[in-house]
């Protein structure tokens, strides 16, 4: 019996349609020059961690449900007296997605989570870093379908960074537009 290998919907779309569209738009000489997604990093900073050291663990559990992968607890690199933060204190969680999980997360982000954001008018097209990476923030993590709204005691925001192999922002913007990222006009 032949096994059928699972391929995420967006990856199949990238291989079949998006690569060719980018190749025609930017007239690349080499197949390897065509930009692709490298990774997606999701970071959750928990400001209340100074008062309650269990908060980053709860945030990490929510992040694991959203990403489908166990996050790493981030710790403070140095002490900051003004914020009551001590060195090596847990202050958040982050996860790096690659491969199939990255495409599946991006599919849920574009088609489910972003439309559920209150007063959403589109992503800022200027949020690129100059090297082809796109960063965005979400104020409430409950926009993801994996989070049960009734069981949430506190809402956290998160940073989502989409890293691409594109050398310029214009090429990365074209790649993400092909993936149907809802950029502001």
Curated annotation (Swiss-Prot):
<keyword id="KW-0699">rRNA-binding</keyword>
<dbReference type="InterPro" id="IPR031310">
    <property type="entry name" value="Ribosomal_uL5_N"/>
</dbReference>
<dbReference type="GO" id="GO:0003735">
    <property type="term" value="F:structural constituent of ribosome"/>
</dbReference>
<dbReference type="InterPro" id="IPR022803">
    <property type="entry name" value="Ribosomal_uL5_dom_sf"/>
</dbReference>
<dbReference type="InterPro" id="IPR002132">
    <property type="entry name" value="Ribosomal_uL5"/>
</dbReference>
<dbReference type="Pfam" id="PF00281">
    <property type="entry name" value="Ribosomal_L5"/>
</dbReference>
<dbReference type="GO" id="GO:0000049">
    <property type="term" value="F:tRNA binding"/>
</dbReference>
<dbReference type="InterPro" id="IPR020930">
    <property type="entry name" value="Ribosomal_uL5_bac-type"/>
</dbReference>
<dbReference type="InterPro" id="IPR031309">
    <property type="entry name" value="Ribosomal_uL5_C"/>
</dbReference>
<keyword id="KW-0820">tRNA-binding</keyword>
<comment type="function">
    <text>This is one of the proteins that bind and probably mediate the attachment of the 5S RNA into the large ribosomal subunit, where it forms part of the central protuberance. In the 70S ribosome it contacts protein S13 of the 30S subunit (bridge B1b), connecting the 2 subunits; this bridge is implicated in subunit movement. Contacts the P site tRNA; the 5S rRNA and some of its associated proteins might help stabilize positioning of ribosome-bound tRNAs.</text>
</comment>
<comment type="subunit">
    <text>Part of the 50S ribosomal subunit; part of the 5S rRNA/L5/L18/L25 subcomplex. Contacts the 5S rRNA and the P site tRNA. Forms a bridge to the 30S subunit in the 70S ribosome.</text>
</comment>
<keyword id="KW-0687">Ribonucleoprotein</keyword>
<protein>
    <recommendedName>
        <fullName>Large ribosomal subunit protein uL5</fullName>
    </recommendedName>
</protein>
<dbReference type="InterPro" id="IPR020929">
    <property type="entry name" value="Ribosomal_uL5_CS"/>
</dbReference>
<dbReference type="GO" id="GO:0005840">
    <property type="term" value="C:ribosome"/>
</dbReference>
<comment type="similarity">
    <text>Belongs to the universal ribosomal protein uL5 family.</text>
</comment>
<dbReference type="GO" id="GO:0019843">
    <property type="term" value="F:rRNA binding"/>
</dbReference>
<dbReference type="GO" id="GO:1990904">
    <property type="term" value="C:ribonucleoprotein complex"/>
</dbReference>
<dbReference type="Pfam" id="PF00673">
    <property type="entry name" value="Ribosomal_L5_C"/>
</dbReference>
<keyword id="KW-0694">RNA-binding</keyword>
<dbReference type="GO" id="GO:0006412">
    <property type="term" value="P:translation"/>
</dbReference>
<keyword id="KW-0689">Ribosomal protein</keyword>
